[in-house]
Structures are given as C-alpha cells and as structure tokens.
C-alpha cells in the first residue's frame, strides 16, 4: 500500500489526465456534455491543462537540479586566485587547513587583516598547519611536494625538510606578530596537525575553497547556503579540535619588534613550547622571520 501511495504521488498528473479522459468518455457516451464537439473540446482543454502543469513541474525540477549542480564550482588557473580575492572581501572569518601556509602568509592573512581594519570589522582566524617539530611528518611533506614538481617552486626554493620546518614555524610567528598588532579586532588561533594533508582548505564567511598542492590541479568552491559549505566547515572545526594547540597566550609580555630579532624569535618559540631545532643557525632563524613577514607568493 505504501509503495502504491508513493507511486501515485509521483505520477498524480498522469493519473488525473487518464481519469478525466475516462470520465469525459463515459459522459460523452451518456450524452451529458451536449454535442460531441463540445465534449471533445472540453476533454482536450483539460488534458492540455494537465500537460502544462506537468511541464511546469518538470521545469522546476530541472531548475532545482541545475541549482544543485551549480553549488560546486570548478576553478582553474587564474580563477583560483580570483576566487580567493572574492572570498577575502567583507569576510569576518578565515579558516585555513593545509601544509605550511605559504600562500596564507604571502597574501591571505595580510589582505584579510587590511580589509578588516579598513572596514572596521572584527576578524576571526583559525589556522591549522603541519607540526614543525615533527621531523618525520615534515620530511614526508617535503618529499610529497618535491614529487609533484621537482626543482624550485614559485618562490624560487626547493622543498626540503629544512624548508618545510621553516615555513611552518614562520606561519606560527606570523600569527603571533599580527595578533600583537591587531589585538583590537583580530582573534587568531593556531593548531598543529599530526598528519599530512594533500589538500588545502580556505573558509570565509561566504565560501569554502578546496585546492590541491599541485597548482596545475583544479580547485573546488562551495558557496554558503549551498550543499557542503556547512559540512566542510564542521570538518575543519573537528580537525582543529584534534590538532595540537599552540597557546599563543603563553607569549606573555614578550613584545615582538617590527622586525623580530633572533633572540626574540628564539624566546617566542621557547615560551610556546615549540623549541627550534638545535641545528638551526642564526641565518635559519632570520629566514623564518623573513618568511613570516615577507613571504613570497608561490603562485604569482
């Protein structure tokens, strides 16, 4: 009975057309509707009306299907950077999960902060990058990036274990540096992932942009209010909860200079309980500071 009810609901238009045709035919035989021509015209009009209703319903279904399909946009080449620029506009939120956050430091974080300052809005930032103190994890990430494109990337550097650790440390330093200077409107949290991801997620108040580490690969964009925006948002929140939190409040009274010194940088990571590798020289630390404040765009 339930199956018949579902079938009837799906095919009600055709069923009604059939019933009306049968009824009109019976009435015609009984000579109730007047002349034969009147009977035929009445039947035709009613059936045409039902056919029109059916077409309208199908058109609405097609429109809904098209709208659902447009919920996911494929992006290639310049479309990716254009989508990021659109996402940064008027956003009050930015969630990032990826490798080391090079593009985040070079473009995203600076522009989001500048837009929020100019428009006098609050900005909440959540960052999740790989743990720079996990040597095995950083080595695996460096090997993965090198396998995608051997040789220097858009920054002019090759992916090595040392570079990977520097990039991730630089993201943490950048978060602390901007946090101190924009405390009136910026809230920023940092988590360190214990696993490597081959994707990058960027979430703004309006969009989720999902890219791959390979710049030649297509990206996906999901708009708020459409399927998957909330799902991916929840996914990143859940992932962040499982990440190793960097307690930025532990910085205490340490005030970073406009150009943090080597001593300030060492002290910062000590207070964050993220000791720099003993093998890192002063030149390496200077490089971390440069990457934190003046990172090169890897996708110019």
What are the residue ranges of the model-derived segments?
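N-terminal alpha-helical membrane-insertion module
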Residues: 1-80
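A broadly tuned preference for mixed-charge, low-complexity surface segments
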Residues: 2, 6-10, 142-156, 247-273
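PLD-like (HKD) phosphodiesterase/transphosphatidyltransferase domain
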Residues: 52-147, 277-300
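Low-complexity, flexible helical/coil segments
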Residues: 127-139, 149, 160-167, 224-229, ...
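HKD-type phospholipase D/PLD-like phosphodiesterase module
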Residues: 141-199
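HKD (HxKxxxxD) catalytic microenvironment of the phospholipase D
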Residues: 187-227
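Signature of lipid phosphatidyltransferase scaffolds
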Residues: 210, 215-300
């Amino acid at each position: 009975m339930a199956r018949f009810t579902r079938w009837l609901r799906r095919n009600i238009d055709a069923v009604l057309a059939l019933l009306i045709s049968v009824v009109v035919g019976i009435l015609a035989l009984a000579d109730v509707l007047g002349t034969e021509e009147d009977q035929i015209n009445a039947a035709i009009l009613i059936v045409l009306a039902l056919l029109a209703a059916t077409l309208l319903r199908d058109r609405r279904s097609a429109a809904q299907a098209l709208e659902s399909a447009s919920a996911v946009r494929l992006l290639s080449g310049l479309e990716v950077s254009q989508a990021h620029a659109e996402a940064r506009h008027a956003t009050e939120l930015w969630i990032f999960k990826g490798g080391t956050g090079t593009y985040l430091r070079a473009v995203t974080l600076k522009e989001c902060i500048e837009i929020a300052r100019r428009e006098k809005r609050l900005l909440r930032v959540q960052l999740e990058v790989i743990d720079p103190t996990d040597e095995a994890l950083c080595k695996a990430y460096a090997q993965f990036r090198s396998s995608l494109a051997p040789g220097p990337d858009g920054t002019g550097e090759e992916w090595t274990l040392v570079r990977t650790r520097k990039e991730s440390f630089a993201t943490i330093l950048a978060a602390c540096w901007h946090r101190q200077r924009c405390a009136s409107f910026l809230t920023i949290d940092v988590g360190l992932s214990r696993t490597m991801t081959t994707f990058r997620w960027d979430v703004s108040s309006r969009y989720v942009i999902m890219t791959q580490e390979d710049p030649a690969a297509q990206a996906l964009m999901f708009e708020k209010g459409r399927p998957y925006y909330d799902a991916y948002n929840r996914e990143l929140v859940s992932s962040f909860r499982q990440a190793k939190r960097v307690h930025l409040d532990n910085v205490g009274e340490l005030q970073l200079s406009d150009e943090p010194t080597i001593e300030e940088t060492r002290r910062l990571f000590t207070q964050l309980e993220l000791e720099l590798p003993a093998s890192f020289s002063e030149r390496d630390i200077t490089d971390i500071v440069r990457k934190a404040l003046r990172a090169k765009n890897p996708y110019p």
